[in-house]
Amino acid sequence: MAEASSLERQSPGAASCLPHSLCPGEPNLQTTAVVSMGSADHQFHLAEILSQNYGVREEHEGAAPGPEKPEEELEKDFVSQSSDMPLDELLALYGYETSDPISERESEGSDTAAHLPDMTLDKDQIAKDLLSGEEEEETQSSADDLTPSVTSHEASDLFPSQSGSCFLADADKEPGSSSSSDAEEDPLPANKCKKEIMVGPQFQADLSNLHSNRHGEKIYENEDQLLWDPNILPEREVEEFLYRAVKRRWHEMAGSQLPEGEAVKDSEQALYELVKCNFNAEEALRRLRFNVKVIRDGLCAWSEEERRNFEHGFRVHGKNFHLIQANKVRTRSVGECVEYYYLWKKSERYDYFSQQTRLGRRKYGPSGNTDADQDLEGSDPDGPGRPRSSPPLPLPAAAHGPGPEHDRLAQMHTEPLSMGSSMSRSLGEPGEALDVPPSSEPGPRLFPPLDEPSALPSSRRPPALAEPAFFPPATAAPEPGASPRLAVDLTLPEELPLVSSHEDTDGEPEETVGPPQVALSVAEFGLIGIGDVNPFLASHPACPASGLHSEPLSHCNVMTC
């Protein structure tokens, strides 16, 4: 291989091309084309070189019929085979019959010449090169000129599917051809490397004609409309006009006037009416009086009845403005209710409302519930959120008198009856007391109790059942020591009156413990027949009267289902 490389470097008449594939379908077969450019005797056409290469391909196919090897391995085998071949066979393989005398002389020292540069400073060598004649210079120049043309044009015509880069000479083996290809490339012009920044009046467009044409044009066809001019009337007169406008509106809606010291808010509608009236205050006020589309203040537009209904609806339904509008404030829309709610929250009326609601919740509500939202939304005692089985919240001490008839009928279905342990003892066997266990202790019960009433202190006697016309109400007041919960509308015969829960059947006081209670609903009296109770009560001895008015059981107003 060293001999071949020295031959390629020193022979002026040979130009080698890179190994390339002769057939696109068989990329594994590589060959090398050499074109002689020295003299007419040693010139070969490219067709003859291709015929030699086809012969080499057939030899390779016959010698290696086995499995195909990779391209790199075939290239290495070809290089190693060509390096081991003698010089004469290598020249015959590439189509050379005779060699130049200069190449034969320099091939003897190929081992040392491979590591030396092409140029030398030896005077003898320079003289021999000069004496060798002008033939060498002509051959070198012709090789440099014709190598790119042969490899680029003829090979590209024969193999159009192959890229032109496969037929160019290697830069390491042929510095002459690489330098010629570099010389063919034109350098970049100077204006492409350094661009000029176009700044200045000479690079600007002339828009004078465009601006002159647009001076008379309008942005839109509609004319501008004046909404307010602050320079015509002084500020004091404007404030007086606004105050009079608000005063007239208050007089029409609620019949009252604004205080003198209160600041007047701006009203865009009133000011716009003043502009339309050419700043005539009297005419603007006259138009505002009869204009139904004037934007009114939210708090001023609502009457006192509407405010009370809204507050009651807010206490019952919370922030469900649809229910408030449907049930409480039907004269307003849902949007107006929402607007009034946010205006109402900023007023002193809302502060007073929240204070009263929180006070009522602390006094009568369950302990530990102090949330402001729950106070405002669920603090109504008559609201739908209160369970039916829970007792009604007592009224203040000032409301001890009998309420209206519809309140008594409404509470009759929700408030359970309660009895003390003394009544259950009086209904027991003779000589022993019948103890009714509390609701938390297991055991048999005389009557299945309902939910036990709350243990909150009561300031008045709970309302009794509705008495019929023939039943006289109880007139005797209970003893001072008796619990108000023991007084019920169920009375017994005179022989067996009720005894206070704080005294035993023998008259001795009991321990100060919370008396057990039995809650009886009206429907449960239907389980007991009057004929079964009267003989049972007649067998018991009489007890001293306790001061309570009593009637026979047959006269009791019992509702059966």
UniProtKB/Swiss-Prot annotation:
Keyword Nucleus: yes
Ranges in coiled-coil conformation: none
Protein name: Mesoderm induction early response protein 2
Domain SANT residues, every copy: 297-349
Cellular component GO terms held in the UniProt record: nucleoplasm
Subcellular location: Nucleus
Composition bias, Low complexity: 417-428, 453-482
Purpose: Transcriptional repressor.
PANTHER family recorded: MESODERM INDUCTION EARLY RESPONSE PROTEIN 2, METASTASIS-ASSOCIATED PROTEIN AND MESODERM INDUCTION EARLY RESPONSE PROTEIN
Residues with Phosphoserine modification: 11
Gene3D superfamilies, per the entry: 4.10.1240.50, Homeodomain-like
The ELM2 domain, residue ranges: 195-292
Annotated GO biological process: negative regulation of transcription by RNA polymerase II
GO molecular function, one term: transcription corepressor activity
